[in-house]
């Protein structure tokens, strides 16, 4: 634990186009080397593609995709008597959002489309409809937690 005072959390401003704090957070997750304008261009381009492809409001598809990707439980390693156990723990809300955004970003980067905005649009549409790489990752994490349910009494 640091001995200095606790650093206050910075407030994230909502994005100018949609007024969504989650969208700004996602841009920050997507950003590489501090190039926020590039991240903004990718996200807004992807949202335009989503509106073209689905005909639904892009921000709704985005919110649905993130909500579907949020994990409920995950496993953490805990050492007990010389053995490491994968202990299932509930994920706190702020971490749920962060993990979901990270998984959507990583799944989009692995896709085969030509540009990042097309990849991101495809992944967001897939995640909102209950499929895609981000949901595969979530299911994998849930499976791990389910498999190690027996160790849940080793809580943190």
UniProtKB/Swiss-Prot annotation:
Keyword terms: Ribonucleoprotein, Ribosomal protein, RNA-binding, rRNA-binding, tRNA-binding
rRNA-binding among keywords: yes
MF-aspect GO terms: rRNA binding; structural constituent of ribosome; tRNA binding
Biological process according to GO: translation
InterPro entries, A to Z: Ribosomal_uS7 (IPR000235), Ribosomal_uS7_bac/org-type (IPR005717), Ribosomal_uS7_CS (IPR020606), Ribosomal_uS7_dom (IPR023798), Ribosomal_uS7_dom_sf (IPR036823)
Coiled-coil zones: none
Keyword rRNA-binding in annotation: yes
Gene3D superfamilies: Ribosomal protein S7 domain
Function as written in the Swiss-Prot or TrEMBL entry: One of the primary rRNA binding proteins, it binds directly to 16S rRNA where it nucleates assembly of the head domain of the 30S subunit. Is located at the subunit interface close to the decoding center, probably blocks exit of the E-site tRNA.
Subunit organization: Part of the 30S ribosomal subunit. Contacts proteins S9 and S11.
NCBIfam families membership: rpsG_bact (TIGR01029)
Family in the record: Belongs to the universal ribosomal protein uS7 family.
Protein name as it appears in the record: Small ribosomal subunit protein uS7
Species in which this protein is naturally found: Neisseria gonorrhoeae (strain ATCC 700825 / FA 1090)
Lineage of origin: Bacteria, Pseudomonadati, Pseudomonadota, Betaproteobacteria, Neisseriales
